[in-house]
C-alpha cells in the first residue's frame, strides 16, 4: 500500500518494533500450522499449498476475484503466478490476523509480483 510521506518522515514511535513483528509472524505461523493440521499431506505453511488447498483456504469475494482476474489479463500472468499470488495474499491476511483473504491482500500480493517481475526478473 502507498505510504503517507508525512507519516514516513514523522514520529517513528508508531512503527512496529522488531519484537512486535516477530510476534505477529509467530502467530501467523501458528495459524498456518493449525489450518493444515488435518491435511493428509505434511503441510506446514501457505507456501506449500497445492491447487486444492488454495481453492479451500483462499476463498475470494467478488471484488477480489475481479481484481485478480484483471491483473491476470493485464499482466499476462500464468496459472502458476495466479497460485503464487493467492498464497502470498493468504499469508498477508494471516500476518494481519484476518481469517479472510480480502481485496487489499490481493492488491498487495499483486504489487509484490509486479515488483518481482520488474526488478528481479
Model-predicted segments: where are they?
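Basic, amphipathic alpha-helical bundle interface domains used for macromolecular binding and assembly
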Residues: 1-120
Amino acid at each position: 500500500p502507498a505510504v503517507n510521506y508525512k507519516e514516513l518522515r514523522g514520529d517513528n514511535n508508531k512503527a512496529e518494533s522488531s519484537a512486535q513483528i516477530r510476534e505477529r509472524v509467530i502467530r501467523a505461523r501458528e495459524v498456518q500450522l493449525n489450518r493444515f493440521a488435518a491435511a493428509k499431506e505434511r503441510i506446514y505453511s501457505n507456501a506449500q499449498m497445492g491447487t486444492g488447498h488454495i481453492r479451500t483456504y483462499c476463498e475470494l469475494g467478488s471484488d477480489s476475484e475481479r481484481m485478480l482476474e484483471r491483473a491476470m489479463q493485464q499482466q499476462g500472468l500464468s496459472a502458476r503466478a495466479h497460485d503464487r499470488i493467492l498464497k502470498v495474499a493468504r499469508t498477508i491476511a494471516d500476518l494481519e490476523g484476518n481469517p479472510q483473504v480480502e481485496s487489499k491482500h490481493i492488491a498487495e500480493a499483486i504489487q509484490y509480483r509486479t515488483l518481482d517481475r520488474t526488478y528481479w526478473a
